[in-house]
Structures are given as C-alpha cells and as structure tokens.
C-alpha cells in the first residue's frame, strides 16, 4: 500500500507584455504566491532566469491519494492557463511513496 503521492507539474510561461526582467519577476512572483495559497503547492522557477519574457515553473504537491494530487495539478494548470500570460508546454507526473 502506498503511503502517499507526489504530483509534479512543469509549466512553460510566456509574458508578452513584460519588457524587462523586473516586469517578468512581478508576474512570476504573483504566479508562485497564488499557486502556494490556492493549492498548497511548493513552487520554484527552474529555467529562463535571465530571459525577460519566459519562465519555467515546477509545482509540487504531496497528498494521500493519487486522485487528489492529479486534481490539484489539473486545477493549478487551469489557473495558469487563465491568467494574463501565455501557457506553453506543460508536463505532469505522479509518483507514489511506497511503504517499503
């Protein structure tokens, strides 16, 4: 029996309205805060740190059941798709934490 699940979402974001790193960082900060507050997720910017119109975020959740992790990631993806930036390539993965 599994003791828990880790859900990971990787999302490429494009900020067509950002004209500087400062503007991009405002978008990224907002996205990270909202993902943490709404979904209880851990969030990190993992790529494109010095590119002012792109970012790659990795979002992680830990739950007791696979369905809950999958639902949280789907909700997080929908949230990212509904914002003022463009959502690019997205990947999702669920990993079980075995009792062994």
Label each PLM-derived region with a short phrase.
Residues 42-46, 86-89:
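Short, flexible active-site-proximal loops enriched in glycine and acidic residues
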Residues 1-6, 50-54:
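Short coil/turn motifs at beta-sheet boundaries
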Residues 2-42, 79:
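N-terminal first-folded block
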Residues 9-13, 57-59, 90-94:
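A structural signal for short, well-ordered beta-strand segments
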Residues 63-100:
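C-terminal structural segments of small proteins and small subunits
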Residues 39, 55, 86:
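Residue-level signal for beta-strand positions within conserved beta-sheet cores that form or flank
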Residues 43-64:
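Short, charge-patterned binding micro-sites
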Residues 19, 25, 47-50, 91, ...:
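Solvent-exposed, flexible loop/coil residues
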